[in-house]
């Protein structure tokens, strides 16, 4: 779709990482080709954000999350980052409904601000809020409510995945 790339005047322009099919049509017929936009940044494996808003057990998250579990409470599960600069990946449950996944955070060392922003910009639409917070929204209809907040207020870079701005505290 147009969220991955666009075609105009014979040129395909990449917009975000992903795969799309471009179809050119003329009086003589049409032709289609698949275009795959490869990432420049492979900074980290994104958490299973597609599970946010779903009723899901801790065991089901453990089954999809390949990182090493380091802590678990009734309302959260924390995993060790897969690389030295990733401090922690944490899944949070809704306090009112402890079976519903509410948000996910990923914490990075402070020195990785640019790397993390570039990684997210390849995948999401950035919308700066202020000098410390950038919201990143997906273009995909199936994940239209997913929002990623990037913040460098602390001594680390914090990403928070959630469904809507009300769920994500800035």
Language-model-derived ranges and their functions:
Residues 54-170:
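A cross-family detector of function-defining hotspots
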Residues 41-56:
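Disulfide-bonded cysteine-rich modules in secreted/extracellular proteins
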């Amino acid at each position: 779709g147009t969220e991955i790339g666009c075609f105009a005047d014979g040129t395909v322009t990449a917009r975000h990482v992903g795969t799309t099919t471009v179809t050119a049509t003329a009086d003589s017929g049409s032709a289609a080709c698949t275009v795959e936009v490869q990432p420049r940044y492979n900074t980290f494996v994104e958490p299973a954000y597609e599970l946010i808003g779903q009723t899901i057990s801790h065991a089901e998250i453990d089954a999809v999350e390949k990182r090493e579990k380091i802590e678990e409470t009734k309302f959260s599960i924390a995993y060790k980052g897969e690389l030295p600069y990733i401090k922690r990946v944490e899944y949070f449950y809704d306090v009112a409904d402890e079976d519903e996944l509410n948000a996910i955070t990923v914490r990075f060392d402070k020195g990785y601000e640019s790397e993390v922003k570039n990684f997210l910009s390849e995948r999401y639409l950035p919308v700066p809020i202020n000098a410390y917070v950038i919201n990143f929204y997906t273009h995909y209809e199936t994940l239209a409510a997913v929002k990623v907040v990037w913040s460098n207020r602390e001594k680390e870079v914090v990403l928070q995945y959630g469904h809507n701005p009300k769920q994500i505290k800035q």
